[in-house]
Amino acid sequence: MNPEHSPLGKTTVYANQYDASLLFPIPRAGAREQIGIGAPLPFFGTDIWNAYELSWLNARGKPQVAIATFYVPAESPNIVESKSFKLYLGSFAQTAFESIDAVRDALKRDVSAACGASVTVRLATPAEFRKLQMDELDGLSLDRLDLDADVYETDPSFLTASHDEAPVEETLVTDLLKSNCPVTGQPDWGSVQIHYVGAPIDHAGLLRYIISFRNHTGFHEQCVERIFIDILRACKPVKLAVYARYTRRGGLDINPFRTNYNQPMPDNARTARQ
């Protein structure tokens, strides 16, 4: 399905009775082909979705609430368009479920079917809300650099590495990622963490590269994969991981993670801007 056929940017009737058909899958393959990503994938990882506006009725008609987290594997053939995800979650509002396990089972079944792969679902109840963490991405901030920038369309030529120097292991972060929804043009704001092992990457060039996404259009997952593949091609690190945390829209935040080496799943800690 093409994004143009999704609910994005269209007048919407909000359903309040459970309806799995509201989920709108979008194949990953098209955007990957545009940047030369084929099989086998040069990375693995996950897309972490946090849903803050989930509510349903219990068997006695009393409203229940939870925060849902979805872990969508990067190798799944589809992503889910975010407005359709919001509408789908909203359809739970006036539907009675026997238990929270029944809600979780429905979410896992439906989102897995839309994505074409097994999706992990976790639900945090109000009793657990105080345990939820807020933290910033670890790493050396690129935003400390005082530099000029005037390129706002993606330009990987900014990416360079010093291959005549000894390899390093670095974790770099920036809060200056901004891209735009390819359907509505709405801005998407994000923070990015880049961990690599290899020839030292020029920090100023890397920051200018991230800034060059400012007028770029692409879904969150596609932008992170473009960042990953551009750094991999231009700088040739032995190990590379890219993790972005985007600010919330419509009660959802999307946090894609891509890596080419085995490591633990990144923390799902909400940043201050989220």
Swiss-Prot record:
Superkingdom of origin: Bacteria
* GO cellular component entries: cytoplasm
Gene3D superfamilies documented for this protein: 3.30.1130.10
Record-listed E.C. numbers: 1.7.1.13
Q: Which GO terms describe its molecular function?
A: preQ1 synthase activity
Give the UniProt subcellular location, in the record's own words: Cytoplasm
Keyword Oxidoreductase set for record: yes
- The enzyme's main class, written as a single word, is oxidoreductase
Transcription regulation as UniProt keyword: no
Which residues bind NADPH per the record? S82, K83, R249, G250
Extract one GO BP annotation from the record: tRNA modification
Keyword terms, alphabetized = Cytoplasm, NADP, Oxidoreductase, Queuosine biosynthesis
Under InterPro entries, the record lists: GTP-CH-I_C/QueF (IPR043133), NADPH_dep_7-cyano-7-deazaG_red (IPR050084), QueF (IPR029500), QueF_N (IPR029139), QueF_type2 (IPR016428)
Cited SUPFAM superfamilies: Tetrahydrobiopterin biosynthesis enzymes-like (SSF55620)
Residue positions annotated to bind substrate are V80, E81, S82, H220, E221
Q: What is its main location?
A: cytoplasm
Question: What is this enzyme's catalytic activity, as reactions?
Answer: 7-aminomethyl-7-carbaguanine + 2 NADP(+) = 7-cyano-7-deazaguanine + 2 NADPH + 3 H(+)
| Pathway annotation | tRNA modification; tRNA-queuosine biosynthesis
Q: Which residues form the active site?
A: C181, D188
Family under the similarity heading:
Belongs to the GTP cyclohydrolase I family. QueF type 2 subfamily.
- What is this protein for, i.e. what is its function? Catalyzes the NADPH-dependent reduction of 7-cyano-7-deazaguanine (preQ0) to 7-aminomethyl-7-deazaguanine (preQ1).
Q: Which HAMAP family match?
A: QueF_type2
Q: How does it assemble?
A: Homodimer.
PANTHER family named among the record's database cross-references: NADPH-DEPENDENT 7-CYANO-7-DEAZAGUANINE REDUCTASE
- Protein name per the record: NADPH-dependent 7-cyano-7-deazaguanine reductase
Gene name linked to the record: queF
